[in-house]
A protein has these predicted regions:
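Predominantly soluble domains enriched in secretory-pathway, periplasmic, or organellar proteins
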Residues: 17, 21-195
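Positively charged n-region of N-terminal signal peptides that target proteins for export
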Residues: 1-6
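Bacterial N-terminal signal peptides
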Residues: 8-18
């Protein structure tokens, strides 16, 4: 009889813990108005994507963005406590602290970045790297203070030349940051390198 009680107790404990462990599954999506609308809207929508939720597929809240920002991508830091939003229309990067509700945008000035493309965060969650397509730069930032700390120029005659930086990956194990190139902002010239 004792093995049965132990089994029943263990099963009950597992089932109760799995119920307690369930959590929301949310997604952040950037959106903008269709062209030729009299009022341009841009923002971040937070959507419930848990198929078991009664709110599945519903937008739970919106974070408005400036209408001239042209938000491009959303990137998360390593522990998903912050979301970074790159912009094609301004020399600015936004960050949202996802541990503090209500969510608020914090602007990070990146004056050496003409068009913010991709962002990667170091494995220790202390540094972010932002590729800047229009200005041929990579901006290094302090991920704890959320401010730009250094501009790595990819313009010639620097040792590592890359035109129109786009994709970025970090591998701390080999102490490398890899940056790929793309086309120029006006689509007239193609980059063709990885640095």
């Amino acid at each position: 009889m004792k093995p049965y009680r132990l089994f029943a107790f263990t099963l009950g404990l597992l089932l109760s813990c799995s119920t307690l462990a369930s959590a929301e599954i949310l997604a952040l999506l950037n959106y903008e108005s269709k062209p030729d609308q009299p009022v341009r809207r841009e923002g971040i929508a937070i959507m419930d994507i848990d198929p078991e939720s009664g709110n599945f597929g519903k937008i739970l809240m919106e974070i408005p963005l400036p209408p001239d920002l042209v938000a491009h991508h959303i990137f998360f830091n390593r522990d998903r406590s912050k979301a970074y939003i790159t912009a094609l229309g301004k020399s600015i990067l936004h960050v949202v602290n996802l541990r503090t509700f209500p969510y608020r945008l914090q602007a990070i000035d990146v004056p050496d970045c003409q068009m913010g493309e991709d962002l990667a965060v170091s494995e220790d969650n202390r540094t972010w790297y932002l590729t800047c397509m229009g200005s041929n730069n990579v901006i290094m930032g302090d991920a704890l203070l959320d401010k730009a700390i250094k501009t790595v120029s990819a313009e010639e005659p620097s040792v590592a030349t890359i035109r129109y930086p786009h994709g970025i990956a970090i591998h701390n194990g080999i102490d490398r940051v890899l940056v790929t190139s793309t086309v120029s902002p006006d689509m007239s010239d193609a980059g063709e390198s990885i640095t």
